[in-house]
Amino acid sequence: MAPKQDPKPKFQEGERVLCFHGPLLYEAKCVKVAIKDKQVKYFIHYSGWNKNWDEWVPESRVLKYVDANLQKQRELQKANQEQYAEGKMRGAAPGKKTSGLQQKNVEVKTKKNKQKTPGNGDGGSTSETPQPPRKKRARVDPTVENEETFMNRVEVKVKIPEELKPWLVDDWDLITRQKQLFYLPAKKNVDSILEDYANYKKSRGNTDNKEYAVNEVVAGIKEYFNVMLGTQLLYKFERPQYAEILADHPDAPMSQVYGAPHLLRLFVRIGAMLAYTPLDEKSLALLLNYLHDFLKYLAKNSATLFSASDYEVAPPEYHRKAV
């Protein structure tokens, strides 16, 4: 019996395509094609997005760049904007009473994610495109319905401990109002904080399975931080500083440069991003338990991790860059 042949890819390297990211379709470019275990996968670059968002995707997420699919892209965008207006796809909120940074980020979650792609986001601005109300959702094929159904049922809430909320507000105030900058490289960077947490959990005599899970969660937090920092975790005033860091340390992961305040900002935003993961509700609940445990660790060690003395007044020449 002749061996089964590998499937033939539908798309070629360099081809312009449309690709699902979450519930929406985005213009993208097929950079590489690979066949593994009889499955075709494509390395995708989303047009206009930071290269950190490049990823391998299965063929089921990729569509031809033709008029019919462009129309489908527009219909999905309108349908999801309607859902956002109804509050059905809201991301995480840190608590009922919010002020300063927390309130700002809640607004970003509900408005910004579908108005601006992650590649050109900014921690200090949002933009909206008003759409007329739709009485009836556009008819789409079953694949698209599956994407929408998945998104509708996921609501990820990451709760920030009360002890940490004042640090979020202070961080926001120091940078946006007092025009100070967090001193970089951080005295204790994100990698070091995560390593200390993993060692702390290990010292408590966890089983091998739990130790493995902690290591996976720590690695995941680090990856999310490095991907999201430049696009979603910075205030406008910090961007020139970030550009300088990239120029001075082009090959360094940002988790080796930034510290606790920026790591804490991640948890205000990460709930909205977790809605895009393919995890079922049980797996998400388990992941949230680990994330909340890490936040408790940050709260317990907040006196050593967070300090206003870690910020410095920006010099006059920096202000000119930040305008």
UniProtKB/Swiss-Prot annotation:
The keyword DNA damage applies. Residues 94-227 are annotated as: Sufficient for interaction with SIN3A. It comes from the Eukaryota. GO terms for cellular component: NuA4 histone acetyltransferase complex; nucleosome; Sin3-type complex. Residues 149-303 are annotated as: Sufficient for interaction with PHF12. Signal peptide: none annotated. Residues 125-191 are annotated as: Interaction with RB1-1. InterPro entries: Chromo-like_dom_sf, Chromo/chromo_shadow_dom, MRG, MRG_C_sf, MRG_dom, MSL3_chromo-like. The modification N6-acetyllysine is found at residue 104. Keywords: Acetylation, Chromatin regulator, DNA damage, DNA recombination, DNA repair, Growth regulation, Nucleus, Transcription, Transcription regulation. One of its GO terms (molecular function) is chromatin binding. The keyword Transcription applies. Component of the NuA4 histone acetyltransferase complex which contains the catalytic subunit KAT5/TIP60 and the subunits EP400, TRRAP/PAF400, BRD8/SMAP, EPC1, DMAP1/DNMAP1, RUVBL1/TIP49, RUVBL2, ING3, actin, ACTL6A/BAF53A, MORF4L1/MRG15, MORF4L2/MRGX, MRGBP, YEATS4/GAS41, VPS72/YL1 and MEAF6. The NuA4 complex interacts with MYC and the adenovirus E1A protein. MORF4L1 may also participate in the formation of NuA4 related complexes which lack the KAT5/TIP60 catalytic subunit, but which include the SWI/SNF related protein SRCAP. This is Mortality factor 4-like protein 1. It comes from Rattus norvegicus. The lineage of its organism: Eukaryota, Metazoa, Chordata, Craniata, Vertebrata.
